[in-house]
Amino acid sequence: MKNIFLHSLSLENYRNFKNLELKTDNTPIILIGENGSGKTNILEAISLFYPGRGLRSAKLANVCKTSEDHCLVKALLQSKLGLAEFTTQFKRSSNRRITEYNESKIANNELSKFTSMVWLTPHMEGIFTSGSNDRRKFLDRIVYNFDPKHAELVSKYEYYMHERNKILVEDIRDDNWLKIIEEKMADISNHIANNRLKTLEFMQQAIDDLENEFPKADLSIDGIVEQKILNGKENIVSFITAELYQTRSKDKLLGRTSFGVHKSDFLVKHQKKNILAKFCSTGEQKAILIAIILAEMNYAIKLTKIAPILLLDEVFVHLDDKRRQYLIEFLTGLNMQLWVTTTNLEGIENFANKAQLIKL
């Protein structure tokens, strides 16, 4: 099994840190400090070495230290391809982010070729009651760990969708180019939808197989394209192309694409109660979310033989003793690099004895 882990992390002008240097190894790491000390900022910096905008989905201008034009995050990381140096930097003046692998520029969506990462934050605990966009992105992040090429597909789809919207809204008379774009969107959509369905099948099996102290969930996806595939419809690409063609006039008025895999919703049910997670209590929602994360970790390791980095922000807060103890035993048994934030060690003393403590 390959372990993805950080050997070192350097921050320059990042959030509240002017300069920070951390040396780590493939063991659990506990970041301990008062609220506002920068614990979550460190997790966010690590998450930037995975496709997307990090665990906060922050705008570039917000990650640089106040009054500074640039910020830099550097990591020496044991990746899927071996030991490598990764850097990502931002400049307010250009509003650009540049990511490098061993001093060679790479696209953000290429990061899943090198790293594997899972995170859980307090913000995510509202994912079941927020908009479908958050849930869909959560599902796609899970897919990245099973299929690294999925991130590139999602990025390409969003690019072509933006191009289509531009042609329609600006009334650019180029039916040829529009047809090509819609055909590309249709082909990519087919791959995205199938990847999601395949991953959900893996995940459901993982949830059903894993006996733990957290409630089991039933996972599904509510999307026209995914449903057509499940129903055995043939010529999916032709179907999507036709739908995009038929919605041109409507989308021109709306200024957006009204049909496609970007409209799908990730649905989660409390298995025992047979109700959607959004109707469960906040405590149950957190427990269900943890159960999904545990299943993802467990199955990703079994299926891909790669242990990702796990980032947990205040995960032990509001957990009862039984669930806290189970979670600690599960996590320490995974033999992977785990980053945990906390304001104190109460209730996790035994876990702390096996971890590297970093006080902020």
Curated annotation (Swiss-Prot):
Entry protein name: DNA replication and repair protein RecF
The keyword Magnesium appears for this protein: no
Alphabetic keyword roster: ATP-binding, Cytoplasm, DNA damage, DNA repair, DNA replication, DNA-binding, Nucleotide-binding, SOS response
Similarity comment text for this entry: Belongs to the RecF family.
Membrane-spanning intervals of the chain: none
Binding site for ATP: G33, E34, N35, G36, S37, G38, K39, T40
Location relative to the cell: Cytoplasm
Gene Ontology MF, one: ATP binding
Function in brief: The RecF protein is involved in DNA metabolism; it is required for DNA replication and normal SOS inducibility. RecF binds preferentially to single-stranded, linear DNA. It also seems to bind ATP.
GO biological process terms held by the UniProt record: DNA replication; DNA synthesis involved in DNA repair; double-strand break repair; SOS response
NCBIfam families: recf
